[in-house]
Amino acid sequence: MATATVLSRLSLIPNLSSKPKSFSNKRTTVSVRAQASFSDPFVLQLAESLEDSLSPSSLPLQRIRDSSAESLLSTPWPSRRDEPFRFTDTSFIRYSQIEPVSTQQLNSEILDNLTETHFPNAVIIDGFVSNLTIGPSDLPDGVYFGSFSGLPDDLTNRVSEFIGDFDSGDLFWSINGMGAPDLTVIYVPAGCKVDNSIHLRYFSGQTGDRESKRLPVSNPRVFVLVEEGGEVGIVEEFVGRDEHGFYWTNPVLEVVVLKNAKVKHSYLQKESTAAAHIKWTFVRQEAESEYELVEVSTGGRLGRHNVHVQQLGPDTLTELTTFHMCVNEQTLDLHSRIVLDHPRGSSRQLHKCIVAHSSGQAVFDGNVRVNKYAQQTDAGQLTRSLLLKPRATVNIKPNLQIIADDVKCSHGAAISDLEEDQLFYFQARGIDLETARRALISSFGSEVIEKFPNREIRDQARNHVKSLL
């Protein structure tokens, strides 16, 4: 039979002060740092290979590499004994021969077969921007979209104020910080509304093979800064080069949304069924800002999305709407954390998943923290799961931590197979059982897919999900 685990916690806890962060501009090499106190030889070897694979970089990117090296060297490889990875097995990455991708390789096969898009777009292959398409009227004046190295001096100084100023993530976040070969920047000036969404398409140009266990890893990194009153839509699309490509994509997206600004973030993950995809999304929201994420993920032997959103001002809105679908022997994992620190903040989260394979697993760990001064907060979280095969597994852990006392907060979880009365309703109208099941499964995910703001992305996601049924 299918397996489901729900671990729910609603807690009222005392206020905790955060530990101050310290930064050093001094270059610290991996080998010297490791001699002091390091206990995981595998991570040390990986860190050294990342360092050796990169060429010298600009000062802001070098700061990211230095701080990431420090955190990486104090972090062992995660195991199932670690609570954040309790249900997520990363051992197939650990026991592969990991090879950082060190050079940009223009892949004509990928570029020649790109579908048309009406958006300003960039193709990112192995972390390098390989094809940037922006027409003269695609972006308003003052908007920048491209490599950090191409920023004008005034924007370089402005963007550098925020780079590296995010709370640390886990080991995979640090690996990206050390291994990112470039930084793609999206900058929107104050009061500017970008009508056309900016489309980032990620590919892995190099693939290994499962027999030799050679696993190329790429570390794409994107930074978004939206000034006061600005608005932009961002589409991230991760595409597998072939159905059985063996590689590891380890991306990071950092988003700063200043006062009264809006960001609509669409994320479509269709990696190879043999690949690893571990992504971090960090978001900082100032007062009266809005951040909306819509996600559909179906790819990867292991696919994990870590989302961390920090509300840093009052009257702030956060909305996360996500859909994961397992149709192979795979694990799809969403770890989210929303921190509300100011009055009248609002957050809405809906996560849906389908497990349609007997060796498939879905994981949801959703954390919402309402701190002391976040009075009159309105926070809601709901997760719904469909288990369609015997031994299919879902592990769900909603976690709502409330310190404020004047709030409206709720969370819920539902796990089931298709309802017999719904199937009967279709059959009573002459629709066969298989068609009825497909219709119900498709409609389950449509609630999320229809939230994509762009019709092109909605159609693409809808057709992709239908092809997997």
Name each region found by the language model.
Residues 24, 86-88, 445:
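Compositionally biased, low-structure terminal segments
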Residues 22, 105-110, 203, 461:
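Short alpha-helical "patches" and their helix-cap loops
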Residues 1-25:
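N-terminal chloroplast transit peptides
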Residues 2-10, 151-424, 428-431, 445, ...:
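Conserved beta-strand/loop scaffold segments within soluble protein domains that form the structured core
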